[in-house]
Amino acid sequence: MRDDQIFNLIEKEKLREKEHIELIASENFTSLEIRQAVGSVLTNKYAEGYPLNRYYGGCSFIDEIETLAILRAKELFGAKYANVQPHSGSQANMAAIMALINPGDRILGMQLSHGGHLTHGSRVNFSGIFFNTYFYGVSRDSELIDYDEVLKIARDCRPNLIIAGASSYSREIDFKKFREIADDVSAYLLCDIAHIAGLIVAGFHNSSIDVAHLTTSTTHKTLRGPRGGIILSGKDFNKLVTFNGKEKTLSNAVNSTVFPGTQGGPLVHVIAGKAIAFREALQENFKEYISKVIKNTKVMAEYFKSEGFRIVSGGTDNHLFLVDLSSLDLTGADAEKLLERVNITLNKNAIPFDKKSPALASGIRIGGAAITSRGLNESDSLNVAKFIVRALKTRSDIELKQIKKEVVRFIRDFDMP
């Protein structure tokens, strides 16, 4: 019997996505092929272990699928090693951290309120519960990462692991400088490229693969794949590490921390979706897509500046930027709810040195990846920014209703992938 309750809600979500302007920087739209793979019979199969070494029978086709995903990931990122099994970016980070250091060791990561991520040492996350954590941030003046300050902090706290990467930092990250700092204090370097993976494989951001000991990423966001995680390594993939009191290559240690260390059976249907996403990202038109993402994002940021808004760090080099709403006496939480009323979806976000709590926040985060997937160009993105500014400045019910009508009429012209 059909579950009408669930399928009616799915249809409502489908309509919401079609009639809303999606600006959440961590979201994107997958291709139909990816959705078909993720919704396929592969969801039925249990496959603990790795290709040719499973704990269950009947995995011959599963082995081929996972092997394809691994080969495509290695080709796409220029990596020597890839593990495509992590269920999420957070689980990829957990497995990577466990392969490199032991509970109680020291981690130096980016301050969450300055653009970092929960898994980079936050006290409420496994990374801050099981490890001793220290933090670097951005300069108060420039709102850019101060690498000299990172080195100073690293020399003071002597971390076993440094994590480079961010969830709301709009500038290019110099991974080579982070490796120099890590080498200076004899630490491992883990680079989390979840947000910028698409930019890296398209050649619009420097790569961490041969710089970091390990690189982690999600497979959605700018990669446009299904929700999931991946762990990669370049020239250090065969480096010997001490794991559970024994010497192992780094790649073997990661395989152990993914399964059986943090997961059981992999999500084979999602791995198939990842394989398709990697193939899509290997096509020439993916570079064109990422180029448009960056242009669209810059256009929006510049319009906000022209309207008197302060953009954190003064601009953007990637797919996102933060808008400081302090001049409007409006919290990020208020703005998020206000814009939802006009069918524009984004998220509240703390800004560096924010005096408001994370639940309120002083800023909003805006991303250009999803709208670009729907075919919006620079002129269209400018219109999106204008809708937002109008809504934030007016706040009157009558005007908000009018903006919503205009938004729906505008965005309906752009097909969903």
Curated annotation (Swiss-Prot):
Enzyme class (EC, first level): transferase
Q: Which HAMAP family match?
A: SHMT
Gene Ontology, cellular component aspect: cytosol
Gene source species: Borreliella afzelii (strain PKo)
Looking up Pfam families in the UniProt record yields:
SHMT
Provide the protein's localization.
Cytoplasm
Q: Does the keyword Amino-acid biosynthesis apply?
A: yes
The cofactors it requires, by name, are: pyridoxal 5'-phosphate
Q: What is its EC number?
A: 2.1.2.1
Q: Which residues carry this modification: N6-(pyridoxal phosphate)lysine?
A: 221
UniProt function note: Catalyzes the reversible interconversion of serine and glycine with tetrahydrofolate (THF) serving as the one-carbon carrier. This reaction serves as the major source of one-carbon groups required for the biosynthesis of purines, thymidylate, methionine, and other important biomolecules. Also exhibits THF-independent aldolase activity toward beta-hydroxyamino acids, producing glycine and aldehydes, via a retro-aldol mechanism.
Superkingdom, natural source: Bacteria
PROSITE patterns named in the record = SHMT
Q: Which UniProt keywords apply?
A: Amino-acid biosynthesis, Cytoplasm, One-carbon metabolism, Pyridoxal phosphate, Transferase
For site (Plays an important role in substrate specificity), what residue positions does UniProt give? 220
As recorded in Swiss-Prot or TrEMBL, the protein's gene is named glyA
Q: Does the keyword Hydrolase apply?
A: no
Subunit-structure text = Homodimer.
One of the GO biological process terms: glycine biosynthetic process from serine
Q: Which InterPro entries match?
A: PyrdxlP-dep_Trfase, PyrdxlP-dep_Trfase_major, PyrdxlP-dep_Trfase_small, Ser_HO-MeTrfase, Ser_HO-MeTrfase-like, Ser_HO-MeTrfase_PLP_BS, SHMT-like_dom
Please name the GO terms that the record assigns under molecular function.
glycine hydroxymethyltransferase activity; pyridoxal phosphate binding
Q: Give the matching Gene3D superfamilies.
A: Aspartate Aminotransferase, domain 1, Type I PLP-dependent aspartate aminotransferase-like (Major domain)
Q: What is this protein called?
A: Serine hydroxymethyltransferase
